[in-house]
């Protein structure tokens, strides 16, 4: 792999194009400020990159991008497939403005069976680690939790954390309601529990017929040995499996060994693009999800380009199914890259018959319905913005970005300020910020509000003065009454800001829908009707700000209390405190530990274990 760079100050695009090699690779376009505009891959770098500057038939999105190109960087690769993987890595790392981006930064969740002596069944998101078993990925957390509930009913596996499991002396409620076999207190042998784990894994791998035959054999054996309670338990499992099977997709092409299958349906309408993903794992439909890339810079989106971008971003470097059924072609280079990572051949199916054709048709209908719903949502959001703009005396076109602030603490402890952002007709969680309040006295909400507003907008002024691009809000919402909004006005005067301010107070009766709006620059204080679209928008942003502030405050408070509880114990410094928390999984586990358990922690003597135990009890 070889990278070619040239100093941006002396960059000559025609000369650069003349010297480009006719080799596969990745190219990156930058603007005058050095910000990456676009990343692409090519079989022939010279032909591909030169085409941007020699042709005039580009889409509006690409034409707008080309006008801003100041300099170019390229990286030569050994093949188009290698270039595709590198391109995808660059796109994920740099988020270029003019690339097609399917914004779903979180990793997908899995169902995990841990490598513990008595494996835990759990929801998992993150890097896959041995010796745990993972099943998925699932489209969303609800799909994982639904599967866990099913497995609890049939196989009764534990879901508690290891730190809790190791310190129980009696069964929990899940045992009482027949959702767990209580391995924590020895109500099931290790061999029998592992047999249940194997059965659950067999079910998750889609081998339901094989599992049913195994359970039937065990039921008959138990009955022959006059073990009627055990035989009844196997009978109940078989019945539960039958009910679940009737509600699942089963791939009749290979019913005894179902494959992992993904369905991808592309739909394009009225400038919107949707890719609908359906996940089938082990013959079970575990969920589906609609993805919408940002098309605001592309009034005439090419669906095939977006579909290819989705496949690359969704699968490269991630878990892959054996079969992908889709209503668009997948380029050979992309197939090669995916199969290279997967380690075996994958099937890409566009021509379907029978039930697979029905599945794909359903996915297409869901994609089209998702676009219709998105259009309706956008229309509703625009209506809300229009009404709020009218209230603020602004043009609708001038009101896009709202920022909202809230303060949270418990009697002055662990004060946190939140700033949430509403932009492009939706909340923008990736742009949220929390601020630890450091200068205000505990419990002084006014000083806390002054600190957060001064820090945020003072820093933005400094950044702008240094030539950085800053995204200012079109209006700022303050969760609070006249006192809080008065502080905001004074900060505006100090910083010389002229951004519209809106205060939202709970009103005399503190009921939803009875909020009072405060417009400090006109002196108006009034209520909107409970069905007002503008009020609904303000409530949504305000509630999100409150949620974000209070969750941050609770984390900070709980962390401080854990540290304080152990730090107050003579002989427990930072290293021993960390060793205790790591060993027992948190303060709750330390409190539940016996004196003997505490002694087993490195650095904890018998005398110190006694001191810790007495302090916590």
Swiss-Prot record:
Entry keyword annotation includes DNA repair: yes
A Gene Ontology BP annotation from the UniProt entry: nucleotide-excision repair
Residue ranges of every copy of the UVR domain listed in the record: 209-244
GO cellular component: cytoplasm; excinuclease repair complex
InterPro entries, per database record: GIY-YIG_endonuc (IPR000305), GIY-YIG_endonuc_sf (IPR035901), GIY-YIG_UvrC_Cho (IPR047296), Hlx-hairpin-Hlx_DNA-bd_motif (IPR003583), RuvA_2-like (IPR010994), UVR_dom (IPR001943), UVR_dom_sf (IPR036876), UvrABC_protein_C (IPR050066)
Keyword Cytoplasm recorded: yes
GO molecular function: DNA binding; excinuclease ABC activity
UniProt xrefs under Gene3D superfamilies: 5' to 3' exonuclease, C-terminal subdomain (1.10.150.20), GIY-YIG endonuclease (3.40.1440.10), UVR domain (4.10.860.10), UvrC, RNAse H endonuclease domain (3.30.420.340)
Domain GIY-YIG: from-to ranges: 22-100
Functional summary from the UniProt entry: The UvrABC repair system catalyzes the recognition and processing of DNA lesions. UvrC both incises the 5' and 3' sides of the lesion. The N-terminal half is responsible for the 3' incision and the C-terminal half is responsible for the 5' incision.
Assembly description: Interacts with UvrB in an incision complex.
Name this polypeptide is given: UvrABC system protein C
Phylogenetic placement of the source organism: Bacteria, Pseudomonadati, Pseudomonadota, Betaproteobacteria, Neisseriales
């Amino acid at each position: 792999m070889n990278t070619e760079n040239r100093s941006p100050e002396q960059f000559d695009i025609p000369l650069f194009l003349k010297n480009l090699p006719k080799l596969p690779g990745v190219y990156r376009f930058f603007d005058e400020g050095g910000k990456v505009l676009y990343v692409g891959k090519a079989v022939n770098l010279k032909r591909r990159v030169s085409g941007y500057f020699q042709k005039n038939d580009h889409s509006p999105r690409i034409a707008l991008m080309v006008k801003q190109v100041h300099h170019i960087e390229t990286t030569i690769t050994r093949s188009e497939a290698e270039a595709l993987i590198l391109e995808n890595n660059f796109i994920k790392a740099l988020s270029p403005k003019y690339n097609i981006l399917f914004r779903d930064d979180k990793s997908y969740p899995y169902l995990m069976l841990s490598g513990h002596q008595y494996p835990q069944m759990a929801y998992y998101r993150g890097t896959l680690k041995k010796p745990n078993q993972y099943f998925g990925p699932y489209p969303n957390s609800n799909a994982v939790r639904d599967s866990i509930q099913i497995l609890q009913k049939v196989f009764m596996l534990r879901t508690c954390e290891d730190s809790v499991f190791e310190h129980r002396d009696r069964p929990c409620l899940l045992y009482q309601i027949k959702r767990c076999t209580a391995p924590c207190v020895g109500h099931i042998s290790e061999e029998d529990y592992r047999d249940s784990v194997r059965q659950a894994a067999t079910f998750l791998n889609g081998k339901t017929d094989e599992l049913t035959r195994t359970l039937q054999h065990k039921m008959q054996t138990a009955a022959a040995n006059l073990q009627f309670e055990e035989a009844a338990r196997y009978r109940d499992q078989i019945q539960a499996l039958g009910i679940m099977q009737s509600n699942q997709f089963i791939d009749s092409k290979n019913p005894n060994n179902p494959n992992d299958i993904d369905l991808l349906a592309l739909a394009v309408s009225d400038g919107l693009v949707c890719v609908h993903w359906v996940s089938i794992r082990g013959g079970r439909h575990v969920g589906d999800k609609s993805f919408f890339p940002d098309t605001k810079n592309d009034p005439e989106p090419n669906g095939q380009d977006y579909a290819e971008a989705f496949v690359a971003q969704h699968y490269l470097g991630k878990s892959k199914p054996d079969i992908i059924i889709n209503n668009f072609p997948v380029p050979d280079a992309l197939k090669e890259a995916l199969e290279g990572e997967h380690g075996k051949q994958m099937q890409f199916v566009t021509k379907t018959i029978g039930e697979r054709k029905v599945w794909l048709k359903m996915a297409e209908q869901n994609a089209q319905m998702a676009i219709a719903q998105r259009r309706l949502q956008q229309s509703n959001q625009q209506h809300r913005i229009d009404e709020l703009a009218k209230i603020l005396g602004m043009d609708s076109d001038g009101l896009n970005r709202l920022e909202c602030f809230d303060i949270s603490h418990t009697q002055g402890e662990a004060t946190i300020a939140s700033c949430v952002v509403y932009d492009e007709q939706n909340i923008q969680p990736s742009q949220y910020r929390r601020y630890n309040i450091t200068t205000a006295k505990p419990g002084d909400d006014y000083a806390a509000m002054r600190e957060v507003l001064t820090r945020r907008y003072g820093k933005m002024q400094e950044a702008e003065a240094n030539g950085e691009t800053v995204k200012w809000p079109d209006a700022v919402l303050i969760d609070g009454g006249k006192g809080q909004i008065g502080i905001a006005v004074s900060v505006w005067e100090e910083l010389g800001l002229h951004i519209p301010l809106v205060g939202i107070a709970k009103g005399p009766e503190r009921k939803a829908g009875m909020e009072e709006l405060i417009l400090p620059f006109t002196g108006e204080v009034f209520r909107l009707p409970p069905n007002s679209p503008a009020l609904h928008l303000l409530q949504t942003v305000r509630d999100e700000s409150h949620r974000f502030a209070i969750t941050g405050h609770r984390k900070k408070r709980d962390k401080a209390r854990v540290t304080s509880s152990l730090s107050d114990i003579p002989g427990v410094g930072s290293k021993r405190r960390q060793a205790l928390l790591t060993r027992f999984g948190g303060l709750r586990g330390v409190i539940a530990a016996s004196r003997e358990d505490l002694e087993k922690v490195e650095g904890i003597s018998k005398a110190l274990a006694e001191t810790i135990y007495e302090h916590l009890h």
